Each structure stands twice: as C-alpha cells, then as structure tokens.
C-alpha cells in the first residue's frame, strides 16, 4: 500500500540526506525538479543548509503537520518502489540510481544530468488558483 519514493541530497561531505515519501512516487521526478528549480530561483542553491530545508519543504508541501507520509534519513534509504534521484551539491548534477531498499543502499547509476538539464527535462509549470 503506497507509492513509496526517496529523493537524495548529497552533501558536500558526501553524506546523503534522503527524503522518503510514502505516496510520492507519482510524478516524483517533476516534484524533485520543481523543488530544485524553486531553490535555484530563490538564489539559495549555493547555501547548502538553506537549500536542504527549502527542497525538503517543497517536497513535503502542506503535509508538515501530518504524522504519516514523509520521513528523513541519512545515508540509508527507507522503503522504496522507484529509481532514486540524487542531487549532488558539489557537482550540481542529478543522478538517477537503482536502489536495494532491503539493504537501504543505492546501487547502479542509470543516468546523470546537469542541474539545469534535469529541471528542463522534468519540471512542470505549476499554476496556482
């Protein structure tokens, strides 16, 4: 039950913060691209502490007060049903990985994009009403 996905933020020291979304799989690459686009447009992509918080906030959205649905881990994947996109602050690249969620680790890299390539390919225009 669910559509489990993880999003990775590789820190300058090599550690990876993973954001787990229990129902985040549908449109996950667009969600991640929109979050990265937002933080880049805000001028905070080079400020890792702020960028981490902004990206996580964009992914979680209005669900902050809930007790289910989202989690955060460091260097360990939570339950997962999809490929895992990881943004690397040092290289400004997004790599899509295979993952072994039973072991909690990333395995093979599939494809790597520059930050702007990833945003152009996957970001969706969001219209507020």
Where are these regions (language model features)?
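Short acidic-glycine loop/turn motifs at beta-strand connectors
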Residues: 10-15, 89-91
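Short, flexible N-terminal segments of the mature chain
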Residues: 15-51
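Low-complexity intrinsically disordered segments
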Residues: 36-129
């Amino acid at each position: 039950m669910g559509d489990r996905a993880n999003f990775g933020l590789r820190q300058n020291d090599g550690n990876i913060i993973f954001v787990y979304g229990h129902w985040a799989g549908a449109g996950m690459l667009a969600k991640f691209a929109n979050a990265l686009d937002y933080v880049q447009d805000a001028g905070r992509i080079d400020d890792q502490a702020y960028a981490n918080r902004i990206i996580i906030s964009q992914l979680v959205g209005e669900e902050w007060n809930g007790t289910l649905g989202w989690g955060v881990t460091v260097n360990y994947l939570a339950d997962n049903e999809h490929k895992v996109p990881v943004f690397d602050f040092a290289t400004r690249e997004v790599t899509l990985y295979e993952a072994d969620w039973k072991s909690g680790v990333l395995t093979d890299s599939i494809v790597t994009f520059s930050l702007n390539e990833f945003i152009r390919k996957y970001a969706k225009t969001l219209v507020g009403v």
